[in-house]
């Protein structure tokens, strides 16, 4: 499972983000509106993902998108959003977990506002071990010692069909 601190890398183009036009996730559905999402579009996104990937799939979106979706109801007047009733369990949409990240684009014209899929197919690889450098002189005047650390990582969605995105109308 992808940790929340990796979402920023995954959502954006560092290294190869899921919302990138090249190397990113496949388009699952285009919303009819530039500023809203419907229950039908979420259903279409859900079923645009092939069945084998739905088993481990999660929804990833921005808090503002979550707010909009929490207001949606199905044809029977039931809210699509199902808050978790168990401590430590995530909220769900269509019985799939929902994760939020400030790094996923909000609902706006042309934005890819929701990702749904099996994020196990996004691989993050450590390119080399961490390196640490002790900085004795930098803080010598205050009697402190500083440290500088670096690590090289790379990531890529290795199977584009494992994650689908919902894109707002341009």
Question: Where are the regions that the model predicts?
Answer:
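Sequence/fold signature of self-assembling virion shell proteins
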Residues: 75-170
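Generic serine detector
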Residues: 3, 13, 24, 33, ...
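Residues at beta-strand starts and edge strands
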Residues: 7, 55, 143-145
